[in-house]
């Protein structure tokens, strides 16, 4: 059976650049790869055909011969190139698929020998009072972690000895497995990717190069932090393997509930009780802030639930120098534990206002009852 044109196989024109050829090859190789088409003989043939076309068209000398003579250039005795299939020189699978199959099939090429594992990151949950969060503070914490073993200087080998190069992977930490025409790199099963074998392990860390320890750290909390904020302490996580960098420690902030204030961003909220008389006649009430007490003027005829904004009496955020506001909600308290005389006076006051049915001095009641009347009128109309 005659061979298909190599340009047709890859779906590119004869003027295609090497980049276009490589792009087409990757797409088709992924489509017909045996690992994706197990037991499909047709896909295997197409994969072989695509590979052969790629090897010819990305080799300048072979491409020139193919462009001039076609497939005849690679037949026995036609030009000394030898077979144009898988057995020829061709491209290195690892170079071609390093960025494509590395994640899909685990076969991505990794250069530079074994890679020591960076230490794991750690998290510490820290509770703060509102005052501590707003003003900033320093906190001493204890963190159980893995630290560099001083006895073996992190090598894992007993003092006076050293780790030996792994004989299986020759220090690379990986071995190459071939599945047909496809090369896959895997972690070395002997040294588990470290590239070295410890024959005489350290008595302190038992060959790990790291040991358990509880570290005491002083953490500076910046002013303005809030629940959900995270403080990163670089290099304070677990020690890395074989001298690799340590991980980081993340301090997760949680601000406890306050008995007076609620915080929303840079604003603070609080409720302040006022007497029935002050709400009706007006006056002044002391309001708490994080910096001390301040006076708030209460206008006459203030209704319960009215909000007052005290500008600049909130807090500064960790990312902003602007002060928030204090939002004060006045709550009119109903008097309790009244004496007989006090009850008498209240009854006299109620009668002076026209009794329970009167709404002249009760703006909310007037609005409410008018609304109720309209509601029932609409139902019966």
Swiss-Prot record:
Cofactor needs: Zn(2+)
Residues at which Zn(2+) 1 binds: 149, 152, 202, 205
PROSITE patterns named among the record's database cross-references: DNAJ_1 (PS00636), DNAJ_2 (PS50076), ZF_CR (PS51188)
Zinc finger (CR-type) stretch: 136-214
A Pfam family of this chain: DnaJ_CXXCXGXG
GO biological process annotation, one example: response to heat
Comment on bound cofactor: Binds 2 Zn(2+) ions per monomer.
Assembly behavior: Homodimer.
Domains as described in the record: The J domain is necessary and sufficient to stimulate DnaK ATPase activity. Zinc center 1 plays an important role in the autonomous, DnaK-independent chaperone activity of DnaJ. Zinc center 2 is essential for interaction with DnaK and for DnaJ activity.
Cited function: Participates actively in the response to hyperosmotic and heat shock by preventing the aggregation of stress-denatured proteins and by disaggregating proteins, also in an autonomous, DnaK-independent fashion. Unfolded proteins bind initially to DnaJ; upon interaction with the DnaJ-bound protein, DnaK hydrolyzes its bound ATP, resulting in the formation of a stable complex. GrpE releases ADP from DnaK; ATP binding to DnaK triggers the release of the substrate protein, thus completing the reaction cycle.
Coarse class of the protein's main subcellular location: cytoplasm
Any one GO cellular component localisation term in the record: cytoplasm
Family: Belongs to the DnaJ family.
UniProt: Zn(2+) 2 binding residues: 166, 169, 188, 191
Positions annotated as CXXCXGXG motif repeat: 149-156, 166-173, 188-195, 202-209
Protein name as catalogued: Chaperone protein DnaJ
Gene: dnaJ
GO function term, MF aspect, one: heat shock protein binding
Record's keyword terms, sorted: Chaperone, Cytoplasm, DNA replication, Metal-binding, Repeat, Stress response, Zinc, Zinc-finger
J domain ranges (all copies): 5-70
Domain of life according to the entry: Bacteria
Localization in the cell: Cytoplasm
